[in-house]
């Protein structure tokens, strides 16, 4: 059985979708959720889903505590779901091509440090782009520059707001991310 860890900094909607998707699968277990924020909504979701959840501060991430936890739980694959910290080199070296992320734009557009959530959707609308979407990609040492696994597009509508665009992009995330993860295992 493959053991997955989900890393999330926010409310955890993608973490919940992924956990529910794999709940009935016999070959995959969501073993652990890690967050870097003590008040992240993902903590409550993890409790409801009966998945252990640990808070690891940014400082502790940099000092190797997250890697220790991942090894203790014998994690095979790492899924980032709205995780806002850069993954430290020690984790990258121990999990080559076994860490994936989802980004709410068609990378390389609107990627990099500080480009997450509403910031991305506001930038797409400000630029007047005709389409947006999601990018699922491997993680490397740079923000949002790892090898692309899948991109899925959606239209940007004339009356879109950051919220309406985000809603369509989230639906793409929920639909495609768990399936792509399963295909990579």
How would you label these PLM feature ranges?
Residues 1-185:
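One-carbon transfer enzymes
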